[in-house]
Structure formats: C-alpha cells, structure tokens
C-alpha cells in the first residue's frame, strides 16, 4: 500500500513522516483504520 498520514504523525501532513499505509481491502492484523474513508479503503495505522 501507499503511505498515508496518521493522527500520531503530527498536526499537518507536510514535513512529517507518514507512518500509515493505505490498503485497498481493509487493514492487516495489528493495524487499525485511522480515517473513515469508505468501507473498502483503509487508512491503516499501527496500534
């Protein structure tokens, strides 16, 4: 998946490390969906 922005990464998207991963079929085990972005796309961040 592609990198995505997690709430824990900081207040803004620019200049911060993107620690999330964008998955197209939900999130893998040990991750959680940190943004509500539809039922099939998961903005997944480590728990």
Swiss-Prot record:
Secretion signal: which residues? none
A molecular-function term among this protein's GO annotations: sodium channel regulator activity
Cite the Pfam families for this sequence. Answer: Toxin_4
> Which Cys pairs are S-S linked?
4-44, 6-34, 27-45
Q: Which UniProt keywords apply?
A: Cardiotoxin, Disulfide bond, Ion channel impairing toxin, Nematocyst, Neurotoxin, Secreted, Toxin, Voltage-gated sodium channel impairing toxin
Subcellular location(s) of the protein? Secreted; Nematocyst
One GO CC term, this protein: nematocyst
Q: According to the lineage, what is the superkingdom?
A: Eukaryota
Q: Which Gene3D superfamilies match?
A: Anthopleurin-A
Which GO BP terms, alphabetically?
A: regulation of signal transduction
Q: What does this gene product do?
A: Binds specifically to voltage-gated sodium channels (Nav), thereby delaying their inactivation during signal transduction. Thus it strongly stimulates mammalian cardiac muscle contraction.
Please give the family membership noted in the entry: Belongs to the sea anemone sodium channel inhibitory toxin family. Type I subfamily.
Q: What's the name of the protein?
A: Delta-actitoxin-Axm1d
Species = Anthopleura xanthogrammica (Giant green sea anemone)
